[in-house]
Amino acid sequence: MFLGLFQYTIDTVVKDVSKSVNLSLDAVQELELNVVPIRQASNVTGFLFTSVFVYFFALFKASSLRRNYIMLAARFAVVFLYCPLLYYCGALLDATIICCALIGRLCLVCFYSWRYKNALFIIFNTTTLSFLNGKAAYYDGKSIVILEGGDHYITFGNSFVAFVSNIDLYLAIRGRQEADLHLLRTVELLDGKKLYVFSQHQIVGITNAAFDSIQLDEYATISE
């Protein structure tokens, strides 16, 4: 099963048993008819396991740059070491599915890497990235991005991005989506931290929602 979820299953067992006990042709055919349900269940199970493995492994995005490097090396190891081993052992279908899925995903991210002349698309294994002063991070597709930070720095992904002035500060979205999210507001919190609000849409109003700090006038009356 380790060297092929599709082909190294019941068929291999039937052939090995037939050769070892020297079964006649009629006995082999009868044995194959008896194991048809098991063969079908095994093939379906193998297909599901392989599909889940390929989908997860090809699209997985790590949470840090170092882990992304490890995952990239693992994908190359699967393509250049594991898949040839599958071909050598006769698991042609498994090797073809895994190899095509990983190479197809790699070609897709390589296209965006070539288009924007940036290898981070390949390392992050994504078709869309957000850039802030040369640093890159994943982009979730939202039109409003709120980042934490402080005076003259922003926490961007796993990096700290320092800046002198926030006048020209913006998020550059590149890849499958292209947009420039400009810095619209900077919100200073009581603990000294700041929230930086980036968006393409203009802010038309801000409402303070700290209701527990609002004092009501006991003598206020309602006039009709």
Swiss-Prot record:
Disulfide bonds: none annotated. GO terms for cellular component: host cell membrane; membrane. InterPro entries: a/bCoV_VIROPORIN_3A-like_CD (IPR046446), a/bCoV_VIROPORIN_3A-like_TM (IPR046445), Coronavirus_Orf3a/b (IPR004293). Residues 34-124 form the CoV 3a-like viroporin TM domain. Keywords: Host membrane, Membrane, Transmembrane, Transmembrane helix. Its main location: host cell. Pfam families: Corona_NS3b (PF03053). The chain crosses the membrane at residues 40-60, 69-88, 95-111. It comes from the Viruses. It is found in: Host membrane. PROSITE patterns: COV_VIROPORIN_3A_CD, COV_VIROPORIN_3A_TM. It is a multi-pass membrane protein. Residues 128-203 form the CoV 3a-like viroporin CD domain. This is Non-structural protein 3. It comes from Porcine epidemic diarrhea virus (strain CV777). The lineage of its organism: Viruses, Riboviria, Orthornavirae, Pisuviricota, Pisoniviricetes.
